[in-house]
Curated annotation (Swiss-Prot):
UniProt-recorded name of the protein: Photosystem II reaction center X protein
Function: Involved in the binding and/or turnover of quinones at the Q(B) site of Photosystem II.
Key word Lyase present: no
Any matching Pfam family: PsbX
Family under the similarity heading: Belongs to the PsbX family. Type 2 subfamily.
Source species, domain of life: Bacteria
Chief place of localization: membrane
Length: 62
């Protein structure tokens, strides 16, 4: 079984480049979470809470 370090050396990729690439990939995951996932989740929670309040007030009117 080929170890990761042997695979990186066989591909002529320096450890610095591989580390930088890995760091940038993880940083992009965090950026995506901040820019897309968290606002979308907040919006969905807001809408579901608002809908719940509207349904509650609608049942009180009956």
């Amino acid at each position: 079984m080929i170890q990761i370090s042997n695979l990186i050396l066989a591909a002529d990729v320096s450890p610095e480049v591989a580390g930088s690439s890995g760091f940038n990939m993880i940083a992009s995951f965090f950026a995506a979470a901040l820019l897309i996932v968290i606002p979308a989740a907040a919006f969905l929670i807001f809408v579901s809470q608002k809908d719940s309040l509207e349904r509650t007030s609608a049942t009180r009117r009956r």
